[in-house]
Amino acid sequence: MNQIDINDSHYAEDELHEECGVFGVYDFDGNDVSSTIYYGLFALQHRGQESCGIAVSDTEGPKGKVLSYKDMGLVNEVFNPEKLEKLNGNIGVGHVRYSTAGSSSRENAQPLVLNYVKGTLGMAHNGNHLNAVELREELSYTGAIFQTTIDSEVIAYLIARERLNVPTVEGAVLNAMKKIKGAYSLIVMSPRKLIGARDPFGFKPLCIGKRDNAYFLSSETCALDTVGAEFVRDVEPGEVVTITKDGIKSDKSLCQKNTARCIFEYIYFARPDSKIDGMGVYESRINAGRILAKTHPVEADIVVGVPESGNPAALGFSMESGIPYGNAFIKNNYVGRTFIKPKQEQRESSVKVKLNVLKEAVAGKRVVMIDDSIVRGTTSARIVNLLKAAGAKEVHVRISSPAFLHPCYFGTDIPSEDQLIASGHSVDEICEIIGADSLGYLEVDKLSEMICGQTGYCDACFTGNYPIEPPKIDIRGEMG
């Protein structure tokens, strides 16, 4: 058996990250939208914690004038009332971002604002496209001067170039989509239009909302709830939605039958109070727990979830198995992006700063611990150790997703295969490495049952069945 050193700094970061969240507003009554976008981004903060930004325009003002501000940090760190007051405009777009190592900088924050021969556009992007290198070289050859290292700027320049050949911005977006290979949900703002676009596979979510005389575009419905907007519908995979003062129009010419919506939105990324493509995220996680209880039963005294995403699945496991559900963990909500990672010899203490165990809840008991995933195994090992140190007699780990065996090329920060514990170890070996008494994963063939029979999702990180052929070199370092 190949033993993994769980204290190795190579395995220090053991969480999955969604890359971005996008949010846009067009208020037909002329009200400023910067504060509304701020609250929308606040609701999407879980999708990206490294940088954020807002860009706005006044549809009755000078046609090329776009005001924007972006910086590194959380939404409430970057923006204050004074900054928001300076962002005057009734149409706008916002963005929260997580990036991989090496690409985190203010220059790479979004929204991007691009001035070009036909005017100005602002753009927010969630996803990753696979032919960005080729398109970047092509655009550079024809005169594009790139200011960032992200593939989002490639899309912005591509739209600007296509705008030279068609009479409308939405037509340029549609033409650009025909050239982009990969995953993306976009919100594009011109001074008179707000445009939403979703790739033909529908990897990343995007939905439409309405409040009074304002229309919204958002990565998740939870942000619509936060700003008091009603959910209208999801943007369909391949669809381009254009919002103007005359209302909404849609182009579905790129829609296709075969879709590949990211299944991990339901397992982990999306907030539990969101609905994606008609399916409630909370319900899907309850279902995952119920399925685990049927496929991997165990005799135990208490079921606990690793906060926060493990809690609904733990409740579902309890409901199906009859084993009481309990709270074993106290989470420190003040440990965030700025938490200083300890030196290697102190690394074991880092989980204790984030989580503490209620000893009276687990002492002397057989515990079922539910978590959403195991990536490298480091976090699972430390949490199992915390439970046993608190007196748990047995710890049985149940995972509400299949085993991660392959990297993702579509906008999710899943490591390479050599860093995925399940790629090189059997279930029994992983069980020994993390110190659990047993381990069970949700089976791949149960994913459809988890989302109530829906199909058309991407499970490539579990199966290796990529809906788009992955690149021969790893291009995942610069995601939108």
Where are these regions (language model features)?
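Secondary-structure transition/capping motifs at alpha-helix termini
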Residues: 144, 165-166, 297-301, 319-326, ...
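PRPP-dependent phosphoribosyltransferase catalytic core
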Residues: 177, 192-193, 228-234, 255, ...
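Short, glycine/charge-rich flexible loops or terminal/linker lids adjacent to PRPP-binding catalytic cores
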Residues: 322-367, 378, 405-411, 415
